[in-house]
């Protein structure tokens, strides 16, 4: 009986594999679930929100080309040592960290974790959902 309980527990843990994925409207293929930061960079490039972003590898969906700025348009010397530099850091603004958030943001901040807040700050307003490994995650995209 103990063996059966342990076996069922292990099966439940194996099946409960929550991996986040982010998807936007118009993309017909899956995104790379394991590398969220790089996937978000690809999404922002795909949408044209960060057209000057330089990507070090192709985006994780077929038939897509990476976008890059001409070498003389922007200087990235300070960031060449950092992998997959993003023009805006995926972080929580200091007002939110110190509980000085705007009243309109209060509900959304209370209902999201830190990682979700970071993505909410980067890409907002167009809500889409994508299923990846039995987990549904929303992505919000905003034009600047």
Swiss-Prot record:
It comes from the Eukaryota. Residues 68-113 form a propeptide. The keyword Membrane does not apply. Glycans are attached at residue 133. One of its GO terms (molecular function) is hormone activity. GO terms for biological process: cell differentiation; sex differentiation; spermatogenesis. Androgenic gland. Keywords: Cleavage on pair of basic residues, Developmental protein, Differentiation, Disulfide bond, Glycoprotein, Hormone, Secreted, Sexual differentiation, Signal, Spermatogenesis. Disulfide bonds join 33-123, 42-59, 44-141, 124-132. It is found in: Secreted. GO terms for cellular component: extracellular region. The keyword Glycoprotein applies. Residues 1-21 form the signal peptide. Controls sex differentiation and the formation of male appendages, spermatogenesis, pigmentation, and male specific behavior. This is Androgenic gland hormone. It comes from Armadillidium vulgare.
